[in-house]
């Protein structure tokens, strides 16, 4: 089972990674706030379930070179893993990425069937193909982490987001996968597209006796993003401000940086929100629709580029 919040530690326990981040005047958050939202969230794990299942073909030529055909999203990871498992140099391995089809992060890891096909092909001297059925796809799950998130948001008298405090405990399953990065992403990927006065984040990923969790659709950002945007709606209600107007008032400008140091060059979120407000008929619908119907708004953010996007 997942450890209770506050009782996990690295050592003999089942904690793979723990993260602590603090930016801005964290001690002054509540002192400056006139509105606060505090909520605990419990998110279930989710599997990708792409139409195309995982598959691989492995073949060795007479000179001892391996050729692997696999619908991989990150073929370099497989290339490195094969070299380690087979104990041969990387230049003796060719990895060809075939048509991936649906991936969504679920075909990003080096998988057991890729290693097994290479080993079986070497032992048998013949090409080996492995294709998973749907149940087998679930057994090698690298889906979204089940997680427990405590999210606190605060706004000052000017309606500015003066602070966000987050604690995330995520269920990693039995293997590492992308878990080191996910532990960071649960925090740093909700520090935009808004200006934030202060940010405090603690996160931990724990091993459990389950299929591993990994990268899935908005890797590490979706659960905490949901908590942030819901919290902003609550702050808007407390401040008697329109939710779109609250977001517009707090947006990062172009050529700026998040509180954690991510560079923001171009940003079209303001134009997007203004267009959405106009085209959706927001002013005529918000808080005015019949029981059981409603209209809402939320913003997203994700990193882009080849640089290291986390604070190690």
Q: Model regions: which residues?
A:
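Structural alpha/beta core scaffold segments of enzyme domains
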Residues: 1-312
């Amino acid at each position: 089972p997942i450890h209770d919040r506050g009782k996990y530690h690295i050592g003999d326990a089942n904690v793979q990674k723990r993260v602590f981040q603090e930016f801005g005047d964290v001690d002054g958050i509540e002192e400056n706030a006139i509105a606060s939202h505090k909520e605990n969230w419990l998110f279930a794990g989710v599997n990708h379930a792409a139409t195309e299942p995982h598959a691989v073909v492995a073949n060795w030529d007479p000179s001892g070179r391996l050729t692997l055909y696999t619908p991989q999203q990150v073929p370099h990871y497989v290339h490195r893993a094969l070299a380690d498992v087979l104990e041969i140099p990387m230049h003796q391995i060719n990895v060809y990425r075939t048509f991936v089809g649906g991936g969504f992060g679920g075909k990003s890891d080096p998988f057991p069937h890729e290693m097994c096909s290479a080993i079986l092909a070497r032992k048998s001297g013949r090409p080996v193909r492995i294709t998973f059925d749907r149940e087998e796809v679930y057994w090698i799950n690298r889906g979204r982490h089940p997680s427990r998130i405590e999210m606190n948001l605060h706004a000052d008298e000017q309606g500015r987001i003066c602070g966000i405090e987050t604690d995330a405990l995520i269920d990693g399953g039995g293997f590492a996968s992308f878990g080191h990065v996910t532990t960071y992403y649960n925090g740093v990927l909700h520090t935009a597209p808004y200006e934030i006065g202060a940010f405090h984040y603690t996160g931990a990923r724990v091993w459990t006796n389950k299929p591993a969790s990994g990268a899935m659709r908005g890797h590490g950002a979706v659960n905490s993003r949901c908590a942030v945007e819901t919290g902003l709606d609550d702050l808007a209600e407390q401040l008697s401000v329109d939710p779109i107007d609250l977001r517009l008032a707090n947006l990062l400008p172009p050529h700026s940086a998040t509180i954690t140091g991510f560079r923001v060059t171009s940003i079209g979120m303001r134009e997007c929100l203004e267009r959405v407000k106009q085209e959706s008929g927001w002013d005529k619908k918000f808080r005015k629709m019949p029981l059981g119907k409603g209209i809402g708004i939320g913003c997203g953010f994700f990193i882009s580029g080849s640089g290291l996007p986390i604070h190690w």
